[in-house]
């Protein structure tokens, strides 16, 4: 968050979620904005947009091992509001989450949709990006690249696009993992970029073996899959001798901090690592 | 919130704030969106916009007697982001509130800014709009119409515009009032409209005496002052024999529900009561 992140009060903006202790509970809070033409396609089904808006915020809670308490919506009226409401209904029911409040505005220009999700931590300390240690192993809950294929199918008007349109928030996996992980985050902007961020936050170097990363694309597009976002798998580290309590793939190991935060098959990857905001 | 308000999960949208019990605490949550050209003037000082965005949400918390815990910001980049940050810093420092998180997006079109404010109730049950009873007296914490004069001064480029640019959230008043009020809300959309909403929510009729309403405008503009918004005074009802624990003016009494929710000097007011979203 340019400019704002330098503000002493704005430290929370560097991470996806804020954690706030309140009485006997720890609250986990996240806010994301989707903009038409940037985060979703103009003309995309508003029901899918509603799904994505909610699911991506819940995914942030999943990465904190948090149980959702509800969401607040900042809704800019669009071309088919009833269809948005239908999708909102579907995603809220699917995750058993309440719409606690929000507001509606009319405005010209691309549709801007904001959502705040609120959860309670199921385990404390709440996992962050900053706990990976030398000797940990790096894990991911499932393949990357499915959303990339889904977007291409949607743009082509042909083929399976669910992974792009209706991402899943891995809440149950996050709850199961929270007591054991040394660090955790959801992969929203590309595996290489997000892994690099986690390594930087933890002051370590991540060494990832390309071939061990599960991908949803053909092998020829492995590199795209590792740099594409929107899959919302959980990326986490566990002490070296721990197995994952949920199905997951070990994709590398954590070293002491070297010259580069990320090594791919032993070398710093070149080019764009993912989707930079 | 058209469409959404009919959703069973969307009941919270009918009120300004959501209240959520969590452990030993009650959380109070509100989300408001400001749109350039609708809620603030194009070209208005971004520092003032930041102030208003935060203060209006904190005002919602004030009306619930809630103590702010922090805010989350959905920020669409504008023409002078450092100036926005300066105003944000100022308002957060003024109220001692933390920026917990949020995100930044770039988009064409008018600037859309969303803010979620989170607080903890200082008194339970948390005051709502729906508790006014026959025999209560109706109170307001201060004059209406100052923001109207401020807007006019700002548009004219001459005169005192602080009341419009930098509204105050009456947090201390809200905390002091919460244990005693039968209903409370902040006046954001015009006194007559908001009073009518409170009466409807409480299933009663409010009888307001025009002359007893404190106004910041000349007497000739009393009618404007009663219908204009943006002043963020607290409107509340107390049992008939109670005096207000904070400086406030008694402006009327509560009757059993009659044919109209609101009477002004004994008659239902005609015309537009305030700012309808």
Predicted segments, located by residue:
Chain A
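Glycine-rich anion-binding loops of enzyme active sites
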Residues: 23-27, 34, 67-150
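Solvent-exposed alpha-helices and their adjacent loops that cap or buttress functional pockets
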Residues: 10-12, 20-23, 64, 105-110, ...
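A generic local secondary-structure boundary/capping motif
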Residues: 7-9, 17-18, 89, 100-106, ...
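Short, compositionally biased
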Residues: 146-166
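Internal active-site segments that recognize and position negatively charged phosphoryl groups
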Residues: 133-142, 166-191
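Small-aliphatic-rich amphipathic alpha-helix that forms the alpha element of a beta-alpha
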Residues: 46-70, 83-94, 172, 176, ...
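Glycine-/charge-enriched secondary-structure boundary and capping motifs
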Residues: 77-100, 105-113, 118-121, 179-180, ...
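N-terminal glycine-rich phosphate/pyrophosphate-binding loops that anchor nucleotide-derived ligands
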Residues: 1-55, 59
């Amino acid at each position: 968050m340019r400019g704002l992140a330098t503000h002493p009060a704005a430290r929370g903006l560097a991470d996806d979620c804020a954690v706030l202790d309140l009485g006997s509970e720890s609250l986990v809070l996240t806010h994301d904005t989707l903009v038409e033409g940037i985060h979703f396609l103009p003309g995309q089904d508003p029901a899918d947009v509603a799904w994505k808006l909610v699911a991506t915020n819940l995914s942030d809670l999943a990465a904190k091992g948090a149980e959702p308490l509800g969401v607040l919506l900042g809704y800019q009226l669009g071309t088919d509001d009833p269809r948005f409401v239908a999708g909102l209904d579907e995603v809220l029911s699917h995750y058993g989450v309440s719409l606690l409040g929000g507001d509606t505005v009319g405005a010209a220009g691309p549709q801007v949709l904001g959502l705040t999700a609120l959860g309670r931590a199921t385990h404390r300390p709440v996992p962050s990006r900053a706990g990976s240690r030398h000797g940990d192993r790096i894990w991911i809950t499932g393949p990357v690249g499915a959303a990339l294929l889904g977007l291409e199918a949607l743009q082509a008007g042909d083929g399976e696009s669910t992974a792009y349109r209706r991402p899943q928030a891995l809440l149950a996996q996050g709850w199961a993992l929270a007591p054991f992980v040394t660090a955790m985050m959801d992969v929203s902007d590309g595996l290489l970029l997000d892994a690099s961020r986690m390594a930087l936050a933890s002051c370590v170097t991540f060494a990832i073996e390309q071939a061990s990363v599960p991908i949803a694309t053909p092998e020829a597009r492995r590199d795209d899959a590792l740099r594409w976002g929107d899959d919302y798998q959980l990326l986490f580290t566990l002490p070296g001798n721990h197995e994952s309590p949920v199905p997951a793939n070990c994709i590398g190991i954590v070293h002491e901090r070297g010259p580069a935060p990320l090594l791919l098959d032993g070398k710093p990857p070149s080019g764009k690592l993912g989707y930079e905001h």
